[in-house]
Every structure is written in C-alpha cells, then in structure tokens.
A protein has these predicted regions:
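Amphipathic alpha-helices of TPR/Sel1-like and other helical repeat/solenoid scaffolds
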Residues: 63-74, 116-121
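Flexible helix-coil transition and linker loops at the boundaries of alpha-helical arrays
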Residues: 74-86, 129
Length: 146
C-alpha cells in the first residue's frame, strides 16, 4: 500500500492529501484511543496558521480546499458508505474558515470567502439539515452565509 500511495511532489501539506488514502485502502485498521501521530509546530511550520490565525493566506487556504475536495471525491468512490460524512467534513471545514476569516478580519482571503459562501449557499439544505452538522455550525451558517 505504501508503494502505491505516495506523498505528492507539489504542495506544502502532504499529509492532508495522503493520510486518508491509507485508511481508505487498508484491509484492517486498529484503533486503541491513544494518539500516535504528532509533530512539532514551530513558527516556520507550514501549518502554523492552524494556531496563529493571522498567518492564514489565500495560497494555503486554496490548497486545503482543493485537498478537501479531492478527499471527498476519493472517499466517495472508495468507500461510498462514507460519502455523506466526507461531504459534511468538506463543508464543515469551509464554514470554519468562513468564521475564522470574519473573526480575524483576514481580508486577504476575501475571494475565497466569497467562493466558500457561494458553495455553502448552493448546498444549504444538504449541509444545514444534514445529520452530521453541529449546532455551532448552524449558528455560523445563519450569521455568515445566509
């Protein structure tokens, strides 16, 4: 499996484009409740915007959005029983970024903000009335997308 699923040569966030593929293609997955995946996040780390919100930029956000789109398509094909959850996860990421852009005044992401809001509006019924959405996501949808 590790020979056929490789890290990409382009992009900065290789784990978001590969890790789910390992799980989706594994014959057996064991879970025991203890975190085993960790990394050191320093000021120059590619994903430092996850905790230092002012660092979020359109290039990073666009790469993440593309990775979520690709993941939704891949999981829907390989594990169709998880298609709804994968789609929810993509929309959940979008609404979390919409909220973050508003809260931190990230005007450099205005174009992607509009794109995400348009996408969420187009799928309002499926996301807002879906079985996975959390209450705070509904609040954010009402506040930022409606």
């Amino acid at each position: 499996m590790f020979d056929s699923i490789r890290f990409l040569n382009e992009g900065k966030y290789d784990d978001i484009t590969t890790t789910y593929r390992y799980f989706a293609n594994a014959k057996i997955v064991a879970a025991h409740g203890l975190p085993r995946y960790c990394f050191y996040r320093h000021s120059g780390n590619n994903s430092s915007a996850a905790t230092k919100h002012h660092l979020l930029n359109p290039v990073q956000l666009n790469e993440y959005l593309a990775a979520f789109r690709e993941r939704t398509e891949y999981i829907s094909k390989i594990l169709p029983q998880l298609a709804g959850l994968a789609l929810y996860s993509e929309w959940s990421y979008m609404i979390s970024m919409v909220e973050k852009i508003h809260r931190y005044g990230l005007n450099n992401c205005a174009d992607l903000l509009e794109l995400m809001c348009d996408n969420l509006r187009a799928h309002w019924d499926d996301f807002y009335n879906g079985k996975y959405i959390l209450e705070f996501e509904k609040v954010w949808m009402d506040r930022y997308v409606k």
